[in-house]
Swiss-Prot record:
It comes from the Archaea. GO terms for molecular function: methyltransferase activity. The keyword Methyltransferase applies. Keywords: Methyltransferase, Transferase. This is Putative methyltransferase Mtx subunit A. One of its GO terms (biological process) is methylation. Its EC number is 2.1.1.-. The gene is mtxA. It comes from Methanosarcina barkeri (strain Fusaro / DSM 804). May be part of a complex composed of 3 subunits; MtxA, MtxH and MtxX.
Length: 197
């Protein structure tokens, strides 16, 4: 069985790659804490939406990761750590809102409910929000880095291919005069020369 997706980690972020075979990843929230090579991934997450999405995507694309240590100081207003705990415990509603999150904008837009469910099943979250002592963090990483079995399913690559669609509207009227040479079609939001009409 394949354990790690090709080109893992799938999405870029503010993290360091350590041992991809490790059972633990470390999220330092808004704190910058020196990384240990024993963790699969080690990095910060300051937002309750894109930051949480990146953690989920990079976790479920490596079946070796079974624990996530959440440590460091919370980011004010965004509450990325609280939101990570909430999505793990409660998931998302039909609008993509993280159920139970108190973050400013707790909406997940780029991954599916299936990806969230896989995340909930694959990992155990170790809630040590506020912990910044490197020795204590090292002790936890060393305790969990080899603990447990690989998740019994192949990695899940859950990245949205959703691209912003550009829209082009042909102007129909020059209903706002900008100057003698230019008019604007307010419905299309396009500025044209008066010769175009």
């Amino acid at each position: 069985m394949k354990k790690i997706a090709e080109a893992w980690p799938i999405v870029k972020g503010d993290y360091t790659v350590g041992n991809p075979e490790s059972r633990i990843a470390v999220v330092t929230l808004a704190s910058q804490i020196n990384s240990l090579p024993e963790a699969a991934l080690w990095g910060s997450s300051k937002t309750e939406n894109l930051g949480v999405e990146k953690i989920i995507i990079n976790t479920i694309s490596n079946s070796n990761i079974r624990y996530i240590l959440i440590c460091g100081k919370e980011s004010r207003g965004h509450l990325a750590g609280h939101s990570l705990l909430a999505i793990h415990a409660n998931g998302i509603d039909e609008k993509g809102r993280i159920v139970g999150s108190e973050g400013a904008i707790p909406f997940i837009e780029n991954i599916s409910r299936e990806a969230v469910k896989r995340f909930q099943q694959q990992v155990v979250l170790l809630d040590r929000i506020g912990l910044t002592n490197l020795e204590e963090i090292m002790k936890i990483v060393r305790e969990y880095k080899d603990q447990g079995e690989v998740y019994p399913e192949e990695p899940l690559v859950a990245i949205s291919q959703k691209k912003r669609q550009s829209t082009f509207t042909i102007p129909h009227s020059g209903d706002i005069i900008v100057s003698e040479e230019f008019v604007m079609d307010s419905a299309a939001g396009v500025v044209c020369t008066t010769n175009d009409f």
